[in-house]
């Protein structure tokens, strides 16, 4: 199958949807609070530098596009490796060069996420490089993009969630094996639809 266009690690994937909007956007995530016990709460700090304002309420958190994004992002992600895919994809789509360190654990996750990111982003026209099996960087280099890119998920839920909001920039993008999101966020596609995304699901023959 392919898809077209309360866990903080999963919910943070929604923040890149706000970030990539071409206009002011607002998303409310219920049940997430400032003093999270999950390390991924630091992701909100990083998104601030990309122009996403985080406001905590008694219901959860409200995310709003606000401010001027950084022109470059250098970040040690040793404490938030599960968010690396989201930030890598978001920065590329925003044309923000980056250098992310502390990613040594990505080689031994559900898939080799470093290689997967490099491979799939090339389909979108971005030449991302790695160093020392623990660093991902992009200096703005581009390459010819696929006309109708199909993103492989490698049986990795975070690959699907990191690339899905790219449809805001590339409406023709497709996500292969979308059901992988059930590992951490079973309602991900339904929630995207509620947020205003058009999600089309097609059965594909192997």
Positions of predicted regions on the chain:
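Short, structured segments at the rim of ligand-binding sites
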Residues: 1-206
